[in-house]
């Protein structure tokens, strides 16, 4: 896995410190770090910038930096590309993002050595129908919540 996309929650990765640290680490390991155009701009690392489609399509591994919500959002946006996601927790407790930011490099080392177990997750698709009218389905990784107030056809 040489092409690695780093996808941070910019509210949780203050000053993109963890992102920058992992970019340097991945380079040291002979990998090709990749960032979204927006993150590359904020981190002042334009050489790693890619469009979102390029980022998801051309990466071997996606690293989610944030919490479970960040990972769920990345899972939803990248589902059609079927790429593995490594969740690094930048908060206090994560169920899906089990790896702590202080051990991110060790987790990456395990992945690069092939010392990991890939957990395939079922994705959910939900759409709303009223008579002959139908919404386009949305994709979710964990759960979907539908309420009356948020949607009206």
Task: Identify the role of each PLM range.
Residues 11, 68-70, 93:
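Short glycine-rich anion-binding loops that position phosphate/pyrophosphate groups of nucleotides
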Residues 15, 69-75:
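Short glycine/serine/threonine-rich phosphate/pyrophosphate-binding segments
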Residues 31-38:
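Short internal beta-strands
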Residues 1-4:
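Extreme N-terminal starter segment of soluble prokaryotic enzymes
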Residues 73, 78-95:
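Gly/Ser-rich helix-loop-strand patches that form or flank binding pockets
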Residues 95-153:
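Catalytic core of DAGKc-family lipid kinases
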Residues 47-59:
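Short acidic low-complexity segments
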């Amino acid at each position: 896995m040489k092409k690695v996309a780093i996808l941070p929650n910019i509210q949780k990765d203050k000053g993109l410190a963890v992102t920058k640290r992992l970019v340097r680490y991945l380079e040291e390991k002979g990998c090709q770090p990749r960032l979204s155009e927006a993150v590359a701009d904020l981190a002042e690392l334009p050489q790693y910038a890619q469009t979102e489609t390029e980022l998801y399509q051309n990466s071997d591994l996606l690293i989610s930096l944030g919490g479970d919500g960040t990972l769920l959002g990345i899972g939803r946006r990248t589902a059609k590309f079927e790429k593995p996601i490594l969740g690094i927790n930048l908060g206090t407790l994560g169920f899906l993002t089990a790896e702590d930011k202080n051990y991110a490099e060790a987790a990456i080392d395990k992945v690069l050595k092939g010392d990991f177990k890939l957990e395939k997750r079922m994705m959910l698709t939900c759409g709303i129908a009223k008579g002959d009218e139908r919404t386009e389905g949305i994709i979710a990784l964990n759960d979907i919540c539908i309420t009356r107030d948020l949607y009206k056809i």
